[in-house]
Amino acid sequence: MELNRSISPQRLGAERFRHRYGLTCAYVAGSMAHGVASERFVEAMTGAGLLASFGSAGLSHARVRAAVARLKGSVPDRRLCINLIHSPQAETVERNLVELLLRESVTAVEASAFIQPTLALVLYRARGARVGSAGPQAAQRIIAKVSRREVARHFMLPPPADMLRRLCEEGALSASEADAAGRLALADDITVEADSGGHTDNQPLLCAFPAIRALRDEIAQSFAAAAEICIGAGGGLGTPAALASAFALGADYVVTGSINQACIEAGTSDGVKALLAQAEPGDFAMAPAADMFEMGVRVQVLRRGTMFPVRAQWLYELYRQRDGLDALSADERERLERQLFRRSIDDVWQETRAYWQEVEPQQLALAEQDPRLRMAMVFRWYLGTSSRWAISGDPQGALDYQIWCGPAMASFNIWSRGVGLGKPEDRSAPAVALALMEGAARHLDALWRAPTVAPPQSEQPAAPPVVVEPDAGFIRDWLIAQIAQQISIASEEIDPSQPFESYGIDSGAAVMILGRLERLLHRRLSPTLIWNYPNIDALAARLSAPVRAVAGQPHGDRQAALPPG
């Protein structure tokens, strides 16, 4: 039983989205490249009823194959999601990944960095599509990350007919699959990505989201399948207020990114997590992207504690000004080899050459004939390796750490210090997610309950409000019901004299129960409250004691004066 509650985290966003992926909350942890969104990270999030996308970008095919094999055994099918990043210089890599995911029956991808459909993406959507009694149905789902209307349009319409035809001619699709896919939108869900870490157009969410949502509604008037597309919001989300703003805009789900890198389960080094936890507003910069270097595409990165943004920009300026490696001055070569590469340019080229020989021999053949392309490949070696130095925590490369990150990290740091999540070692990914969702629900609830017109002032001073404190028995029964619901057993099976640890409640579930308890009692509570008391009986007895008022604060703003335990 809960009192005076109209909004819960489970009600935020679209029920349709939660049902699609079997989620308790409409919350997604977006993919973080190079396995930063690790297997452990995905398992923790999906185990808490949330969605997370494995960060396959930048990993070898063998590494991704191993990750898929592990996740298939530990993650519910509907929640298994792998990042599919567009690889304009390596179409074979993209196609091979799609073939792997289809072969392993991975039913959802988070598609990122796509500007338009590709054969590989269309193949993933169309394979297994059929027309049933309920109409056309896809066997695989696509969650597309976009920031511009013209890109979003591609995902709201059916796959291009010429691509479906070509895949049929290749024997990759049957005629019936192509026909069914031609009646579906390319994507099930579209994330409007605002000012995010990594690839970003630095779009403000307040402008980008309504524009893309309106496009969905416009297209749905002539193409009914588009009406089923959920529109989510991502980029810049690092506090409960930010999530609440996204839901208030009409987001069907929210996506976080930067903030997850500093969580316990993230697949990056402790040094990177420490830098992220110290980030303040203004500690971010744009730098050239490794995957689209020649096109001038940029990514948002952490500037604090690293020289990467400055050095990467210098490489791009060299690329624009020089015709090839042989055109570099002696001073430029010396600086490259000593400060950035920490090895000779020839050694870098040999390593780069071996990589392209394995993944895309055609690109290597072009580079052998084009000095400028060869120079770009060498420079991209630094851009890619700087991420690996950061992830591994290589102390020799500390000044060159490339850490994809956006301003949400700074706002998250400021908020987290007040809720017991200020240190990386305290940041369990599910606990962070659930604390944000609980906070967003409280934020919206408070806003929507606030009176729009101030009541007239009485000539007589108002009597202090009467506050009814729930008794120990009521709180005890409430806690039993909450824990029973959380671990899916009957309330009668809960022994309130047993330690909390015996119920198998993780930190994420504890945070969620704590948020509900705060609203029930109309007071703020210690973030570690549940672990400070031996059992339900002891906690209920303490919470039923009168609240010690803080001078000058109304009842609802009092901090429960609870000893450490």
Task: Mark where each language-model region is.
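Short glycine/serine/threonine-rich phosphate/pyrophosphate-binding segments
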Residues: 37-40, 239-243
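Residue-level detector of anion-binding/catalytic polar loops
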Residues: 51, 107, 252-253, 524
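Active-site entrance/lid segments in N-terminal catalytic domains of soluble metabolic enzymes
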Residues: 1-228, 258-260, 394-403, 407-459
